[in-house]
């Protein structure tokens, strides 16, 4: 069983139960199918918007839910027990627009975009990575050149989550000759503008369905000056703040995948008989399942400690903690899902059983929001400062 963190409020627990029911009713029945078909489930995404999950970070004053990081992670975890891709759609518009506007937007930008986001029907993507700028994101080559009152954006972005279905995309581009991160700015770009081209949908190992990926190409895309979020050269700092917020959210998705895999492994071990008894009675498998549970609970404990600190405004050391929790949770997800496949044996390798999908999905949690090697570097840098 999964243990609910002791510091959850009554409101947190009620919300958790609501999302659990929603996930069992709406997500579980389609989770395998949207992976196999790589189909974007518009009908369920619309219900996410109705629940306020997509527009999670939009302030209440603009019609949004203004949800806490803790509740976002609760939603992510419960949804990921069945589907990682649908889990990530909770708070999907955060990185792409809501969080950048909260961190650095003008009042005019907030008034323009937040009411639209609050309806839960607009999808926004986050375009940072480039062919030559992955972990070294500050080396990006996409450029924005001033042309009167406008900017002209040219360049190429890769691995843009929700790119094929996005109405807007937050584009990070070099706007001046300052070295590396100091020369990067952020722009809100309407994907229907002339000069914006999407590449074909990427074919991925996992993480299929609700989170399609594609590349973007920008050819002298003209945007007004007020499309820039923050000041000239402040874009990289905005990107890093978004990623620090989202690392616990991705961690929650990882914990959810792991819990879902453990639940399936335990149920299978109780039911599957070999040598005249359920395989759950063999000590070797009992030890495996015990280790899986311990990894999940330790990851969950750190996760909600980190979210509680963020929600309380206790930001001292938060950057290192967000790196720690992302690494711990995603490594646990990879190990637990792999062990779940092993417990199911040949059945675990079959697509009719969900654990092989969960193992494929778990891998991306070690890569997104910064690879786990980068996270370890950030933790070490904090220790040695």
Language-model region placement:
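A short, Trp-centered hydrophobic/proline-enriched beta-strand micro-motif
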Residues: 120-128
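Short, conserved phosphate-binding/catalytic loop or strand-edge motifs used
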Residues: 92-98
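Short Gly/Pro-enriched turn/cap motifs at secondary-structure boundaries
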Residues: 117, 132-135, 159-162, 175-178, ...
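Flexible, glycine-rich active-site loops centered on histidine and acidic residues
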Residues: 99-104, 178
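Flexible, small-/acidic-enriched active-site or ligand-binding loops
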Residues: 139, 194-222
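Conserved hydrophobic/aromatic beta-strand scaffold that supports enzyme active sites
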Residues: 125, 139-143, 150, 168-172, ...
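Alpha-helical interface subdomain recognition
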Residues: 1-82, 86, 92, 104-109, ...
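A short core secondary-structure module
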Residues: 154-199
């Amino acid at each position: 069983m999964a243990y609910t963190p002791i510091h959850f409020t009554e409101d947190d627990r009620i919300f958790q139960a609501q999302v659990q029911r929603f996930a069992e009713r709406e997500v579980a029945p389609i989770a395998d199918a949207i992976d196999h078909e790589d189909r974007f489930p518009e009908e369920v995404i619309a219900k996410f918007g109705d629940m306020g999950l997509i527009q999670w970070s939009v302030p209440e004053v603009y019609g949004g839910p203004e949800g806490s990081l803790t509740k976002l992670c609760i939603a992510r975890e419960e949804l990921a027990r069945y589907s990682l891709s649908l889990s990530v759609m909770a708070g999907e518009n955060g990185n792409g627009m809501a969080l950048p506007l909260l961190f650095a937007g003008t009042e005019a930008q907030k008034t323009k975009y937040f009411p639209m986001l609050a309806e839960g029907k607009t999808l926004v993507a986050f375009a940072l990575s480039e062919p030559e700028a992955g972990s070294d994101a500050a080396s990006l080559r996409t450029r924005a050149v001033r042309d009167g009152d406008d900017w002209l954006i040219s360049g190429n972005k890769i691995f843009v989550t929700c790119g094929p279905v996005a109405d807007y995309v937050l584009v990070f581009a070099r706007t001046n000759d300052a070295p590396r991160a100091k020369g990067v700015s952020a722009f809100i770009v309407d994907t229907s503008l002339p000069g914006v081209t999407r590449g074909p949908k990427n074919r991925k190992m996992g993480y299929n369905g609700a989170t399609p990926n594609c590349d973007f190409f920008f050819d002298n895309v003209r945007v007004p000056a007020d499309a820039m979020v923050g000041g000239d050269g402040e874009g990289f700092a905005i990107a890093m703040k978004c990623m620090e917020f989202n690392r616990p959210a991705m961690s929650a998705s990882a914990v959810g995948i792991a819990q879902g895999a453990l639940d399936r492994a335990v149920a299978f071990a109780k039911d599957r008989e070999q040598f005249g008894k359920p395989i759950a009675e063999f000590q070797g498998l009992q030890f495996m399942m015990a280790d899986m549970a311990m990894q999940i609970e330790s990851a969950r404990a750190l996760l909600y400690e980190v979210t509680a600190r963020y929600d309380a405004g206790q930001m001292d050391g938060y950057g290192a903690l967000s790196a720690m929790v992302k690494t711990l949770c995603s490594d646990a997800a990879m190990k637990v899902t792999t062990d779940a496949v092993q417990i199911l044996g040949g059945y675990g390798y079959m697509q009719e059983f969900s654990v092989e999908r969960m193992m494929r999905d778990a891998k991306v949690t070690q890569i997104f929001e910064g690879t786990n090697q980068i996270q370890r570097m950030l933790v070490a840098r904090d220790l040695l400062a």
